[in-house]
Regions:
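Nucleic-acid endonuclease domains
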Residues: 1-74, 78-133
């Protein structure tokens, strides 16, 4: 098998052996493999769906905001392979009236990291469904 001839989805399927190649191709940027794959897949799916805005991934250091639409809408992207997503440690416990992002994209994987579905919540929907830290 020539690893250079694999497409991105094949690389993702082989991820335990291919972390370096994934980084070289710009698919992941950090060691947070699940989060990085979720961001990559969200960006890809939004790009190819004419009903959704194209997303630009932000710098890894941007607090709570993973991507921005061409209209300036801020997106948080969370990936999960269980029934719970990660926490937002920089968000206050109580609603302080500040909108920290307009949309939350949930990229949901199976336990084998196969994409199951992508969900999008507004900020208000996120506030209704989130669990406290």
């Amino acid at each position: 098998m020539n690893i250079e001839e694999l497409n991105n989805d094949e690389l993702i399927d082989l991820y335990p052996k291919l972390l370096d190649q994934l980084k070289n191709r710009g698919i992941i940027r950090t060691k947070n493999i699940i989060g990085e794959l979720g961001e990559y897949i969200a960006k890809r799916e939004y790009k190819y769906n004419p009903n959704l805005p194209e997303l630009q991934l932000n710098l890894s250091s941007t607090k709570n905001i993973d991507a921005t639409s061409i209209k300036g809408e801020r997106y948080a992207i969370k990936s999960l392979s269980t029934k719970q997503t990660g926490v937002f440690p920089s968000l206050p416990l109580e609603d302080d009236g500040v909108v920290y992002f307009e949309y939350l994209i949930l990229v949901i994987f199976s336990k084998d990291y196969v994409l199951k579905e992508i969900l999008e919540l507004t900020w208000k929907e996120f506030l209704c469904f989130r669990k406290m830290k």
